[in-house]
Amino acid sequence: MGGGGQLGESGENGCKSAAGVYTWEEVQHHSNRNDQWLVIDRKVYNVTQWAKRHPGGFRVLNHYAGEDATEAFTAFHPDIKFVQKYMKPLLVGELAATEPSQDQDKNAALIQDFHTLRQQAESEGLFQARPLFFLLHLGHILLLEALALLMVWHWGTGWLQTLLCAVMLATAQSQAGWLQHDFGHLSVFKKSRWNHLVHKFVIGHLKGASANWWNHRHFQHHAKPNIFKKDPDINMVDLFVLGETQPVEYGIKKIKNMPYNHQHKYFFLVAPPLLIPVFYNYNIMMTMITRRDYVDLSWAMTFYIRYMLCYVPVYGLFGSLALMMFARFLESHWFVWVTQMSHLPMDIDNDKRRDWLSMQLQATCNIEKSFFNDWFSGHLNFQIEHHLFPRMPRHNYHLVAPQVQTLCEKHGIPYEVKTLWKGMVDVVRALKKSGDLWLDAYLHK
């Protein structure tokens, strides 16, 4: 799903029909890491070599190898015509006239209806951003950081001031997380290069993280949400079992890396407090170093240098590090609950190769709209709309939501909206249900 590449790969991979015309069966043979074909608008592309240079990461392309990637391609790329120019060297043919446009017996009527909805949203200007909206969000992040610093510089470093400072820093970090998400999805500026530049500033300078790390991880999540071996957000490194399939598989195989029937209890001790300050911090830094991503590493270092210059004079080195870790400890709770309540209680399974609309609705739910919920979640309380239209500016999610709901009702697809409290409670309930399934399979199967 990008541009540029090498021609001449197709002949070595076999299955080539006369005049570059292929059946779905032939395309599906090219579905491993060393041999990747995909279909976009009935045209067949060999992306085996290009995958290594794909700006969104090689894994995203691999996840769609042997499949129709039209809907994902459209969802992720803001300038389709521009990208298509660079795809020409990758073209190896097209589908035979007798072949359907969709693979895996997908519902053509549903796909067409969703395509019509996307076109309608574009014609209504729902993919156009309001710069002032994002400027104000950036402004309130910078204001929170400035107030936190001024407070301890002026009133000292007592326990109350330190606690308030940590809360303000955690709030700024959380809101910066939602803001970098906007730029990372290319949903603010018309030019991708400006989105990329500001993304590096927000995630690098304001948060000390890596834009490339986020891109390669997050686009996989959007491409195949809640799908094992494809969505990194559900790779729980054997700490948890999720959904209804994995627990039974682990139970039957007698895998007991953790007491999974108690995972809904130890979740509170592991995921919310440790995800950002421990796992993400380590993973991000190691990724930048091992991949020699010196650009992102330089951006991240500006965050740490700025932070130390601001806080070491008042807290000392150890105190400054402790304050940073405590702020990230608070931020981690915020981040985990917001992100998990929209996904973890939903369907988590192996890849069923569904159409875009069905796949996203199986994996996502919404949280009720309110001023607080919008701000608290970075408008990801409209997780359904965000997953269907990842490039849409978040201030327009609520405008397209009624049309999405109508389309779902037409095709009998559940469209779930919860209260904030129920969304959080359902995370724990889902973990308990999966843990119980594991225990039953472990003991009786």
Curated annotation (Swiss-Prot):
EC class (word)? oxidoreductase
| SUPFAM superfamilies in alphabetical order | Cytochrome b5-like heme/steroid binding domain
* Topology of the protein relative to the lipid bilayer: Multi-pass membrane protein
Q: Does the keyword Transcription regulation apply?
A: no
Which PROSITE patterns has this protein been placed in? CYTOCHROME_B5_2
Matching entries from InterPro entries are given as: Cyt_B5-like_heme/steroid-bd, Cyt_B5-like_heme/steroid_sf, FA_desaturase_dom, Fatty_acid_desaturase
Q: Where in the cell is it found?
A: Membrane
Identify one Pfam family in the record: Cyt-b5
Which Enzyme Commission number(s) are on file for it? 1.14.19.44
A molecular function (GO) term? acyl-CoA (8-3)-desaturase activity
Q: Which GO terms describe its cellular component?
A: membrane
Organism's domain of life? Eukaryota
Known pathway: Lipid metabolism; polyunsaturated fatty acid biosynthesis
Q: Where are the transmembrane segments?
A: 132-152, 153-173, 266-286, 307-327
Q: Write out the entry's keywords from A to Z.
A: Fatty acid biosynthesis, Fatty acid metabolism, Lipid biosynthesis, Lipid metabolism, Membrane, Oxidoreductase, Transmembrane, Transmembrane helix
Instruction: Please name the GO terms of the biological process aspect recorded for this protein, alphabetically.
Output: unsaturated fatty acid biosynthetic process
Its predominant location is membrane
Specify the Cytochrome b5 heme-binding domain's residue ranges.
19-96
From the UniProt record, list the reaction(s) this protein catalyses: (8Z,11Z,14Z,17Z)-eicosatetraenoyl-CoA + 2 Fe(II)-[cytochrome b5] + O2 + 2 H(+) = (5Z,8Z,11Z,14Z,17Z)-eicosapentaenoyl-CoA + 2 Fe(III)-[cytochrome b5] + 2 H2O; (7Z,10Z,13Z,16Z)-docosatetraenoyl-CoA + 2 Fe(II)-[cytochrome b5] + O2 + 2 H(+) = (4Z,7Z,10Z,13Z,16Z)-docosapentaenoyl-CoA + 2 Fe(III)-[cytochrome b5] + 2 H2O; (7Z,10Z,13Z,16Z,19Z)-docosapentaenoyl-CoA + 2 Fe(II)-[cytochrome b5] + O2 + 2 H(+) = (4Z,7Z,10Z,13Z,16Z,19Z)-docosahexaenoyl-CoA + 2 Fe(III)-[cytochrome b5] + 2 H2O
Q: Where is the signal peptide?
A: none
Q: Give the similarity note.
A: Belongs to the fatty acid desaturase type 1 family.
Purpose of the protein = Fatty acid desaturase with bifunctional delta-4 and delta-5 activities. Component of a lipid metabolic pathway that catalyzes the biosynthesis of polyunsaturated fatty acids (PUFA) with preference toward n-3 substrates and Delta(4)function.
Copy the domain comment: The protein sequence includes a number of characteristic features of microsomal fatty acid desaturases including three histidine boxes and an N-terminal cytochrome b5 domain containing the heme-binding motif.
Q: What is this protein called?
A: Acyl-CoA Delta-4 desaturase
